[in-house]
Amino acid sequence: MTVSTQTHSSLVQGISQQSAISRGTASCDDEVNCFNDVLEGVVSRMGSVWKASYVQGYNDPFVHEVERGAYEKYLIIIEGTNLRVINKDTGQDCTVTGSIAAYLAHSGNARGCFQAVTIGDTTHLLNRQRVVAMGSALSPDRPNKACAFFKAGGYKMKYRLVIRIASTDYITEFETPDNSAAGNAEFITTDYLANEFQDSLNTTIFPAIATDGHGTFTVVQAGSTLIITGPAGLNYDIHTTDGAGDTHFLAFKDTVKGITSLPSKCVNGYQVSVRTTGEADATPYYLEYQGGAGTGSWVEVVAPGVALGLDAATMPHIIRNTGPDTFTVSPATWGQRLAGDGDKTAVDPSFVGQPIKSMQFLGGRLACITEYTAVLSRARNAYVYFPDTAQTELATAPIDYDVSNGSSTLIEHTVVAGGKLQFWGNKQQTYLDTGQEAIKADTTEVMPLANYEYDGECPPKAIGLSSLLFGTAIGPWAQITEVFFRGGIAQGEI
């Protein structure tokens, strides 16, 4: 067979598996250390630049690049419980202070077990196998207190206060005089009336309760308000009546129908739940009197005995760049619950009890995504997943959303591409849409994006602002696809 020699201007089509007679002149059987260029033809592949050498064995580590500028780049490498940071320009190890070895523990290859997102000097590191839990700290139990207060006083009026323990009523009464004498005006002032009942409780009612074996009660007066404290664990009720349709003398223990049923003066730390309909199953919120008797106010707080926050040991951790070649690692500080009862209001984030599969920053919020849900932090605060109030839904409140879109497909990875937060699973990709509105609970919905086969082995990678790359296995081969977006919607691929 005759060997022929000829010049080819380019081999830009690369290696071809077609027969020699079928393939074009810009293809070949094999190349070694070559780079195909349309203008320059086949040139030698660019060589590597030696920086440093290490004696370190890795199987399939997790690698994350932190690029602070053209001349300051770092590689974070994790495998097992070992974390190291290398300066890409010098090849030298950086100083890492702190230890998060417990959070790094994982099974299987590290590459698939971790994800990292860097914003500014801070890298948020996610262990995709760690199940999130609530912390052990609970809000304080409510003291065994009751409150009675006067809103007004009237002439020739009978006022009654009843403390009921089991089936026994302990009753004290006071009747004001008529208005026949000018001096009688003193006897209808609210502070005077409260003082009369305080004296009666201390001299008559509380001794009777103690004699019956129910323990010691105390009472404190704050202006026209009486705060009664009973023994811890004792179940008792309190109610009042008056001759003005029960509008002058009011009492409550731990629940009221509205803030108008609360006194303007109380003692610091008194807690009450507000149920606007008065029904037992109504959605409540909780208030606490904070401050002095004459200067304090009612402030929304967490219900008694409720978990205050997330267990930081199970949440994403922080790798912070504190200076050139200097890093610290630690758990993050997550915001605590400020209001609600964790059951009907300010409920636990849906990722509690599950591993977080992916994280992304979007619109000033940190999104934590599980297999079926996405939880976005409070606006402009990536570390808060509880609302500021249980009374209303603020535009800045966290968002907890079911992103399954009616499918059983698990979410493997997420990516922000085309200006949208996308959720990627096999044969189903969706995205978070708010139209032209800012991201908030009442404007958020999940829309279908595409139906690509996707094995989840590698997360999709955004390319610029309008496209992304993703790969998936096709039999023994792998396929790389670039998807283009317009207005966040897939418009084509190569």
Predicted region positions:
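Elongated alpha-helical scaffolds
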Residues: R111-V132, L421-W424, T430-Y431
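Surface-exposed loop/edge segments in extracytoplasmic proteins
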Residues: T90-T97, T168-E173
